[in-house]
């Protein structure tokens, strides 16, 4: 209850946990929560000769040598196929604010990212930069924009919009509460 798996993959209805682990995906909230490898307790894998390796451990504290199951994270199935996984869930934050911002300045976008990471590090979950369509550069159109999608999650209501307005002419996409 009130827990979630923080690796948010865009085509989540089209992928599997084993496939995600074998490619060590990051997802839409990697900025805050890291890659899928950071949210695994253990794995069960099947090698090409049919040998089953069980790295599932019920103990939270496990300081016994290297975590051999980590070899399978990002190996894209080269070492074996992942058949079971024990995943870490984390507490869900109460409030989620999402903003869409347009700017013509990539430098300003990067400065905003640095500002938000310094000020709201524990709450900044996503910062996506969508680059302009390349054809807009070819035809010298002045309407090209960098689109930023920013997501901030918190357990208290914050006035993030005010902070963002310091940097941009904010166009609010949606605020979820």
Each language-model region and where it sits:
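Noncatalytic alpha-helical scaffold of FAD-dependent oxidoreductases
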Residues: 1-177
């Amino acid at each position: 209850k009130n827990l979630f798996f923080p690796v948010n993959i865009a085509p989540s209805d089209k992928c599997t946990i084993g496939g995600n682990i074998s490619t060590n995906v990051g997802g839409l909230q990697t900025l805050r929560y890291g890659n899928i490898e950071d949210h695994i307790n253990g794995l069960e894998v099947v090698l090409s000769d049919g040998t089953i390796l069980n790295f599932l451990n019920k103990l939270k504290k496990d300081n016994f040598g290297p975590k051999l199951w980590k070899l399978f994270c990002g190996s894209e199935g080269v070492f074996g196929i992942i058949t079971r996984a024990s995943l870490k869930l984390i507490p869900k934050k109460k409030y989620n604010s999402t903003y869409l911002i347009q700017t013509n300045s990539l430098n300003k976008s990067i400065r905003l990212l640095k500002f938000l990471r310094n000020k709201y590090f524990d709450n900044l979950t996503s910062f996506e930069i969508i680059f302009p369509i390349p054809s807009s550069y070819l035809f010298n159109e002045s309407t090209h924009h960098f689109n930023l999608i920013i997501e901030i999650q918190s357990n208290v209501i914050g006035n993030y919009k005010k902070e963002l307005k310091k940097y941009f002419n904010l166009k609010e996409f949606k605020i979820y509460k």
